[in-house]
C-alpha cells in the first residue's frame, strides 16, 4: 500500500542538488513520486523511510525522518520547481549548514582519502565531507564541531588541524608544504647517497653476493641501510602500522612491505648464509635504500607541482589589501581590513586595490576588474556604481560606502565557490575511488600469489626469485597515481576557469558541461544588453506622438517590465498624468485610466482580446517585428492609437561568441517571450539555429524539459529570477554575472563578466579538464595494468628478464609525477577564440 513519507534534507545548496536527489529517489521501483526542495522531500510509494534515507545518502546528501507540517497558503501557491531553485540564504551558508575546513597530514593515496572521508562522515552532525588528496584538505558540511572532526581523523590514524579562514589556511598550508618538501628532499638525498654507491659497487665488483670475505662489510652496509630506512623512510612504516591497526591498507603498506621484506631477507642471508644455497645468497640492501630514496624524491617533486596547481586560488587571496583608508569627520586614517564595517566611508586613489564591496558616492575612476571577471578592458565607474573587493583603481579618485565586508564580499564568495569546487568529485572519479578502496589488498594478494607460483614452479634458486617478484609487485603498484588523477585535474581546471572569470560550483558541473550538445539562451539580458530602447513611434486615428508617448509612459509607471523602463526613459522628464485603476494583465500588458481616457498598452493579443481593431496597424507591426523590434500597442478609448517599437540591442560580442560556439558544434536555441516574428528576426541576426518564442516565464523549465526529452544534453544560459527554474532543470545552468542572486546561486556555472564569450570559455575549459582527467585516469590504469603483470614476471617465458625492484620504485615515483605534471598543463590552457 502506498504511503507518503516526509524527510528533512541536509547538504542541498542548489537546484541541481534537488534534481539529483529527486532522480535518485524516483529510480527506485518502490517510489511512485518524489517532491523535493532544498530542505525537504515528500516521497510517495511503498519504500521504507530507512531505504529512502540510505538512497539519499548514497547520492551524497543527508536525510532524516520528519513530521509533516502544514504549508502556509502563500508558500503552497508557489510552484515547487521555483521553490527548489531558491536557497534559504543566498550570500552565505546557513547557520545549520556550516562548513569546516581541515588541513590534513599523513595521507599518501586514494585509500587514505576513503579512510578519512568515512571517519568524517561518521561524526554526528556531518552531512557531507569532501577530502582532497591533492591539497591535503577536507571540507566538511554540517553542524559538527571542529574538535570532533579532528578527533575522528586522528582516530583513523591521520593528522588534522582546523582552519578558521583562508588566510590562516594559506599560511599553514604553505608552511606545511615547504616543511614537507624539505623533509622529502633530505630523506631522498640520504637514501640515495647510500643506495647509489652500494648499487654501483655491487654491479662493478661484488655482484651483491655474500661470501666469508665480505660478510662483515655487508653486515655494516645492512645496518647503515636500516638507519636509512628508519630516518629517511620511517614515515612509510609508521603510516603502514597505523593503517594495520585500523584494518586498512595504503600505498605506505606496499612500500613498507616491499622494502621491509627485501631488507629482512638480505639480513637473514648476511647472518645465516649457511641456511641458503650459494646461488641464493644475493643481497638487496641497495634496493631498500634506492626505493625509499626514489619514492621520497617523487613525493618532493609531486608536492612542488601541487603547489603550482593551487596558484590560481592563491592569486585570488592576494587580491585583498591588508588595510583600507577610512574617511571620518577627523580626516582620513588607515585601518586594518578586519576593522572595516558596512556603512563606513572609504577613499580610493590611483593604484589602490579595493578592500571591500561598496557603492561610489563621489568621484569617477577607471577600475581593472580582470582578476575578478576575466574582462581585460578597464571599466569606468561613477556615482551610484558598485565596486568590488580585489579590483584595482587604474586612474581616478572616488569615495565609496562599504556595503559588504569580510566573508560577505563578492571576492570571498568567489574564493569559497572555487575552494568547494576544487574539493568536489565528479562522477568519473567514483570509479577510481571504488578501485582504490580495494587496490592495496588486491595488490598484496597478487604479490603473494605470484610469489607462490615462482616458489613452486620457478627456476632455482626459487627463494631469490620469489623475493624479487613479491618485492617488485608491491613496489610498482601505485594507488597514489589513481588517487591524484581526478583531484589534480579538478584543482587545475577550476583554478584556470576562475582566472577567466568562470566560477564552477562543483566538479560534476565540469563533467556535464563537457558533454553538452545544445545551448539555450534567454534573450533579454543574456543575448541582448537588457536595456531596451524605443526606436520608433507610429500613431493612428489622429493621435499625436507626444500625447501617445505621455499616456503610454503614465501607464508604465506602475510596471516593472524591462520594456516599461524603455518607454519611461523615452518620455524623459515630462510630467505624467495620474493613472487610476491600474492593472497588470499577465502575458498581455497593462490597463488603466488617465485624463478621462480608458487606456490599454501591450501586445496585439491584448487588443484583440479587448476587441480593438488593429487592421491599420498590421503592416507596421509586421515591419517592426521583422526588424527585431517588439511592437508595443496603445489603445485609447477602444481605438488603436499608437505603436511604440522597442528594441533591445544585441550585446556587442554576442554575434562573435555565438559564431564561436556554433563552430564548436553546439546547437544554439533562443528562448523568449517575444512574438515569433520578432524572435526570428533577432535569431537571424545573431546566428541562432532554433527559436522557442512566446514562452511565459513559468514555461521556461518546461521548454528545457522538451529539449531533454529529445535526447539532448542542454545548458541554459540566463540571468534573471524567472530563469532560476530553467537553470535548475537544465543539465548545466550557466548564470551571467550581472544577473540576480537567485540565478547565480541556482546555476552550476557562473560567469563573472557580462559577455557570452565567457560561455565559450567555460565550455572549452570544461572539455579540456575532462580530457585531462581521462588522460590521468587512463594513464594510471594503464601503468598499473601493465606494470603489475610485468613485475609479476609475465615476460620471463618470452624474454628471460625480470623487473628490478629499484626500477619498479622509480616507475612508481614517475607515475605520480606524470599525473601531477599533466594536470598542471591546464594552468596554461587558453580557450581558442
Swiss-Prot record:
Q: Which gene encodes it?
A: copA
One short Pfam name that applies is: HMA
Gene null: resulting phenotype: Causes a mild defect in aerobic growth on CuSO(4), strongly impairs survival during anaerobic growth on CuSO(4).
Q: Which Gene Ontology terms describe the biological processes this protein takes part in?
A: copper ion homeostasis; viral translational frameshifting
Q: Which residues bind Cu(+) 2?
A: 109, 112
In Swiss-Prot or TrEMBL terms, this protein is called: Copper-exporting P-type ATPase
Cleaved signal peptide residues: none
Specify the inducers: Transcriptionally up-regulated by CueR in response to copper ions.
User: Which residues span the membrane?
Assistant: 186-206, 217-237, 253-273, 283-303, 437-457, 463-483, 778-798, 800-820
Q: Which family does it belong to?
A: Belongs to the cation transport ATPase (P-type) (TC 3.A.3) family. Type IB subfamily.
Domain of life per record: Bacteria
What reaction does this enzyme carry out catalytically?
A: Cu(+)(in) + ATP + H2O = Cu(+)(out) + ADP + phosphate + H(+)
Q: For Cu(+) 1, which residues are the binding ones?
A: 14, 17
What are this entry's molecular-function GO terms?
ATP binding; ATP hydrolysis activity; copper ion binding; P-type divalent copper transporter activity; P-type monovalent copper transporter activity
Active-site residues (renumbered): 522
Q: Which organism is it from?
A: Salmonella typhimurium (strain LT2 / SGSC1412 / ATCC 700720)
Q: Which SUPFAM superfamilies match?
A: Calcium ATPase, transduction domain A (SSF81653), Calcium ATPase, transmembrane domain M (SSF81665), HAD-like (SSF56784), HMA, heavy metal-associated domain (SSF55008)
| InterPro entries on file | ATPase_P-typ_cyto_dom_N, ATPase_P-typ_P_site, ATPase_P-typ_TM_dom_sf, ATPase_P-typ_transduc_dom_A_sf, HAD-like_sf, HAD_sf, Heavy-metal-associated_CS, HMA_dom
Q: What class of enzyme is it?
A: translocase
Question: A GO CC term?
Answer: plasma membrane
- Record: residues binding Mg(2+): 719, 723
Q: What is its EC number?
A: 7.2.2.8
The HMA domain extends over 3-64, 98-161
